[in-house]
A protein has these predicted regions:
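Cytosolic regulatory regions of ion transport systems
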Residues: 1-449
C-alpha cells in the first residue's frame, strides 16, 4: 500500500519502522529538516520537507494516489486540516492523531463529522490500558480481543504461588477454560507445550473468557485497588480520572506545576490535588504514598517515572504503573523489575497498524486483526475462515502448525471456544492465534511446510 505520513516524532518514527518492515511504500512529510534526514537515513522511505497541511506539499506528495494518509504532528488542528485536505484530494483513508480533550469527546468521535477513518488518541488509549490494570491489579498487563469476548493477561509466577511447578496441562483442570499461550523465561519467549511446567519468576500470558479470567486473576488473592495515587497531572491523568469517576476508588493527584494543579482542582473538585514534586522522596512519604494500593507515575520524564517507581516498590507499594514513552529505555532497564509499564507510543502504533493490516488483509488475505505483546515479541492474530481449506474439518491435534504458533481461541457463531486437540475448525470461524513468528498475514502461514 502507498501510505503518506505527516509528522516524524516518536509515533511517526516508530510507525515508519513498522510500515517498512511490512513492505509498504512510505512517504514522510516533516517540517524539521534534521528530523526528516534522520528518519530517511534509517528507513527505506521517501521524504518531503514541508508542512503537511499545505496544499502544494500534498500535491507534490501525490496524495491523490495514496491508500492511507496519516497525520501525526504535535498539533491536533494541523492533523485535522491535513487529513481533510488529503481526503478532498483523493486519499482513500485518513487517520489522525488527536490528543486535546476538547476533540476527544464522544460527540466528536461518534459523529465524526470530518469523515476520518480512524481517530487515535495515545493518551486516552494509555488511560484505558491503566484502567484495565487497575481492574486486575495482579496482572502486569491486560488485553482484550474478539470484541472483548477474550481476555489475555500477563502474570509473574512466584515461588510461593500454587502455580509454581504446575504442568501447563493442569491449568484447564484447575481453572476452567484458560490457556497459557506464552511464557517469558530468562528473557526468552516460549510457546509452551502441555508437558511444560511453570517455574519461579516466569511471566505467563494467559487467555480465557472474562469470567474464567476473573476467577484465575482472583487465585492470586491480592486485594482490589481501593486507593490510587497519580504522580503527574498530564493528559493521561485527565482521561484516567474521567474513566474512574464512578469507581469509588480513593484517588489523589500530585502535580508540580501550580497552574496545572489548579486546573485539575477545578475540573475534579471532589479529588484531593496536591501541588508539589511527586518524584521527591519527602513529598511521597509525606503524602503516604507507601499506603496506597496502586500508584501511577505519569510525569513527562521517563527517567523520573522509572526511578520513582523503583522507590515506591522499595517502600512497599504493591502495584506500580509506570509510563515510559522511549522504548529504547526498555532495552536498558530490567523490565521484569517493574510491576506494569505503559507505553503510549507503542499503544498508538499498534492501534494504527491494526487498522492498516485490516485494510490490507481485507483485500489480500483472511487476517482481520493483530496485537503486539511482550514489547513486540509476541503477536496475537485474528483470522476469519471464509471457506473450506486444509485446516478445516480435522482435529487440531492433526494440524502441523509451525513451531511458535498456538491456537488460543475459536469464535463460532458468537460463542467462544478455548480449544483442545479434539476441536475442529469450521467455515465461518474466527481464529485467535498467538505466535512468535513475524509478518504472518495468511492463515496458511501458520502451517509447517
Amino acid at each position: 500500500m502507498k501510505i503518506i505520513l505527516v509528522g516524524g516524532g516518536k509515533v511517526g518514527f516508530a510507525l515508519c519502522r513498522s510500515l517498512v518492515a511490512e513492505k509498504h511504500d512510505v512517504l514522510l512529510i516533516e517540517q524539521d529538516e534534521a528530523v526528516l534526514n534522520h528518519i530517511v537515513s534509517r528507513f527505506d522511505i521517501i521524504g518531503i520537507l514541508g508542512n503537511g497541511a499545505d496544499f502544494a506539499i500534498l500535491e507534490q506528495a501525490s496524495v491523490q494516489d495514496c491508500d492511507i494518509f496519516i497525520a501525526l504532528t504535535e498539533h491536533d488542528e494541523v492533523n485535522m486540516i491535513a487529513a481533510v485536505l488529503a481526503k478532498k484530494m483523493g486519499a482513500k483513508e485518513t487517520i489522525v492523531r488527536v490528543r486535546n480533550p476538547e476533540y476527544s469527546n464522544s460527540y466528536f468521535k461518534e459523529k465524526n463529522i470530518l469523515g476520518f477513518s480512524l481517530i487515535v488518541n495515545p493518551e486516552l488509549l494509555a488511560a484505558r490500558a491503566i484502567a484495565n490494570i487497575i481492574d486486575f491489579p495482579n496482572a502486569l498487563s491486560v488485553e482484550r480481543f474478539a470484541g472483548e469476548r477474550v481476555s489475555l493477561m500477563e502474570f509473574v509466577v512466584k515461588s510461593t504461588s500454587g502455580l509454581c511447578q504446575m504442568p501447563i496441562s493442569d491449568f484447564r483442570k484447575k481453572f476452567g477454560n484458560v490457556i497459557v499461550c506464552a511464557i517469558e523465561r530468562d528473557h526468552q519467549i516460549i510457546i509452551p507445550s502441555g508437558d511444560m511446567t511453570v517455574q519461579d519468576k516466569d511471566r505467563i500470558f494467559v487467555t480465557g473468557n472474562r469470567v474464567d479470567m476473573i476467577l484465575f486473576h482472583n487465585y492470586f488473592k491480592s486485594r482490589a485497588v481501593k486507593s490510587l495515587l497519580i504522580v503527574g497531572a498530564g493528559r493521561i491523568a485527565y482521561y484516567l480520572l474521567g474513566i474512574l469517576k464512578d469507581s469509588r476508588i480513593d484517588t489523589k493527584v500530585i502535580e508540580i506545576n501550580p497552574e496545572i494543579a489548579s486546573f485539575f482542582s477545578e475540573k475534579f473538585p471532589n479529588l484531593y490535588i496536591v501541588q508539589g514534586d511527586g518524584t521527591a522522596k519527602d513529598i511521597l512519604l509525606e503524602e503516604s504514598a507507601q499506603h496506597y494500593d496502586a500508584v501511577a507515575t505519569l510525569t513527562g520524564v521517563d527517567e523520573e517515572n522509572l526511578i520513582t517507581s523503583m522507590f515506591l516498590d522499595r517502600v512497599g507499594v504493591q502495584k506500580n504503573i509506570t509510563k515510559v514513552n522511549r522504548t529504547s529505555l526498555l532495552e536498558i532497564i530490567n523490565a521484569p523489575d517493574f510491576s506494569s509499564i505503559i507505553t503510549p507510543k507503542s499503544i498508538a502504533v499498534d492501534t494504527i497498524m491494526h487498522f492498516i493490516r485490516g485494510r490490507v488483509n481485507a483485500q489480500y488475505s483472511d487476517l482481520q486483526a493483530m496485537h503486539h505483546l511482550a514489547n513486540g515479541q509476541i503477536e496475537t492474530l485474528q483470522f476469519h475462515i471464509k471457506e473450506a481449506n486444509k485446516m478445516t474439518a480435522k482435529p487440531l491435534s492433526q494440524l502441523k502448525l509451525k513451531k511458535g504458533v498456538l491456537i488460543a481461541a475459536i469464535i463460532r457463531k458468537g460463542k467462544t471456544i478455548f480449544p483442545t486437540g479434539e476441536d475442529m475448525l469450521e467455515v465461518g470461524d474466527k481464529l485467535l492465534v498467538t505466535t512468535l513468528l513475524p509478518n504472518i498475514t495468511k492463515i496458511y502461514d501458520l502451517i509447517a511446510r
